[in-house]
Regions:
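Membrane-proximal helix-loop-helix units in multi-pass membrane proteins
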Residues: 62-135
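Loop-to-transmembrane alpha-helix initiation sites
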Residues: 61, 116-118, 157-170
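Juxtamembrane/interfacial segments around transmembrane helices
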Residues: 90, 119-120, 140-152, 168-180
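Juxtamembrane "helix-exit" motif on the non-cytosolic side of transmembrane helices
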Residues: 42-52, 77-78, 102-111, 150-155
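N-terminal topogenic module of multi-pass integral membrane proteins
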Residues: 1-60
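Central hydrophobic cores of alpha-helical transmembrane segments
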Residues: 29-39, 137-150
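Hydrophobic, membrane-inserted alpha-helices
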Residues: 11-16, 120-129, 143-151
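Membrane-interface capping segments at transmembrane-helix boundaries
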Residues: 79-81, 176-184
């Protein structure tokens, strides 16, 4: 279910900027935050009005999705601090998720919606297959979420419908395995 709210990806970017630049000057953090909000919310179309800019803040991306994306970014940054990763599948899952997230973020660029849709579809299929190689159960759940999002034509958002539940499970089990390795 899609929730129309003011929680968009820009709030995740705001948190990441303030987290990674916590030792920098406050003016730099505010300027980077303003740039990220504008870039992640402006839709570059034929004409851009103030009303269109304000309505772009109510994108149909659920707050739960934003929290999961933020949790995954923090998880992947934590994993990259302690190389090497466990397996090649972990590398591929992280790589394809970041590519899928990048194509979703770059959706405001003025190229064809069809090409953006196809890129998201390709990266989500690669993400599902790499997730299936890492964990068959999570891969099947992700493939079911992808197919259900393809069947629903209204408010199509691959990232939202694909990653809510599988990403939560993936981050939970990976974190659990890391905790078990640290304890034993």
């Amino acid at each position: 279910m899609f929730i129309y709210s003011s929680y968009t990806l820009s709030f995740a970017w705001l948190f990441l900027i303030f987290f990674f630049f916590k030792n920098k000057a406050l003016s730099l953090r505010f300027s980077l935050s303003l740039i990220s909000v504008i870039l992640s919310n402006i839709a570059l179309k034929g004409s851009l009005s103030l009303n269109a800019f304000l309505s772009s803040f109510t994108a149909p991306l659920s707050p739960f999705s934003c929290l999961l994306i933020l949790a995954y970014v923090i998880f992947s940054c934590h994993m990259l601090k302690k190389p090497p990763l466990e397996t090649l599948q972990s590398y591929s899952v992280m790589l394809f998720f970041h590519l899928l997230l990048l194509t979703d973020i770059l959706g405001f660029l003025p190229f064809s919606i069809y090409h953006h849709f196809m890129a998201s579809l390709i990266f989500s299929a690669l993400f599902c297959s790499s997730l299936f190689l890492s964990s068959p159960l999570l891969g099947v759940i992700a493939l079911m979420a992808l197919s259900s999002s393809l069947l629903m034509h209204s408010h199509f958002q691959i990232l939202d419908s694909l990653l809510d539940f599988p990403l939560l499970l993936f981050v939970f089990f990976k974190t659990l395995s890391l905790v078990q390795k640290r304890l034993y």
